[in-house]
């Protein structure tokens, strides 16, 4: 939201919250997401567009997201997020072709512009290790601390590091979260 209007196209994304495939395991903040970019549509007009006058009135500028459940009975908003989140921003970076500095500057400056994006879907997956999604420094130390992060090929396109350190030219897990990186791609 540039302070006056939502910048187009809008981002529509589908989050996967459970730790394991098949919607099983403990809930996490987000394990991965698929997304695409769209022009104004019924989902936008039923949710974000209705908030435009209030956001403008209060002088809000920035990212704004509404989580919803959509089914045969309608669109049901669950929560709003007024900040960039992880790994969503990393996946959006995969799809935005406008340079990020230019995008953020134009947004913060209140400019009327359109985000240049790739066609198709963007996907991101959180690469996790113990103790994620829990906080347990002892488990991290035992199972994950300094673990080597290996790529079959030396291609780091789509790799967004989080808790990683570089030791003698090798990526190793750092921190205590078990959240070393996010991998993104387009198709």
Where are these regions (language model features)?
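Active-site "cap" helix and flanking loop/linker of ATP-utilizing ligase/carboxylase catalytic domains
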Residues: 45-64, 81-155
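Internal nucleotide-binding/catalytic subdomain
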Residues: 1-87
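Short, flexible turn/loop "capping" segments at secondary-structure junctions
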Residues: 24-27, 117, 173-178
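Short beta-strand/turn micro-motifs at beta-sheet edges
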Residues: 20-22, 112-114, 166-173
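Short, well-ordered beta-strand elements within core beta-sheets of diverse protein domains
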Residues: 33-36, 179-187
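A broadly conserved detector of short glycine/acidic/proline-rich loop/turn motifs that flank catalytic sites
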Residues: 13, 81-82, 129-131, 165, ...
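Generic long, charged, amphipathic alpha-helical segments
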Residues: 138-184
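Hydrophobic side chains in beta-strands
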Residues: 70, 126-128, 185
């Amino acid at each position: 939201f540039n302070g006056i209007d939502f910048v187009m196209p809008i981002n529509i994304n589908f989050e996967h919250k459970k730790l394991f495939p098949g919607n099983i395991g403990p809930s996490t903040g987000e394990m991965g997401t698929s997304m695409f970019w769209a022009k104004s549509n019924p989902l936008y007009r039923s949710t974000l567009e209705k908030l435009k006058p209030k956001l403008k009135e209060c002088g809000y500028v920035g990212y704004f997201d509404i989580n919803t459940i959509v089914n045969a009975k309608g669109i049901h908003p669950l929560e709003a997020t007024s900040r960039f989140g992880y790994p969503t921003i990393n996946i959006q970076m995969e799809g935005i072709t406008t340079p990020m500095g230019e995008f953020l500057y134009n947004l913060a400056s209140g400019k009327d512009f359109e985000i240049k994006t790739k066609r198709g879907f963007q996907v991101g997956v959180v690469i996790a290790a113990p103790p994620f999604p829990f906080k347990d420094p002892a488990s991290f130390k035992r199972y994950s601390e300094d673990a080597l992060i290996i790529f079959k090929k030396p291609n780091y396109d789509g790799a967004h590091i989080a808790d990683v350190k570089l030791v003698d030219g090798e990526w190793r897990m750092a921190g205590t979260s078990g959240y070393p990186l996010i991998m993104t791609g387009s198709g």
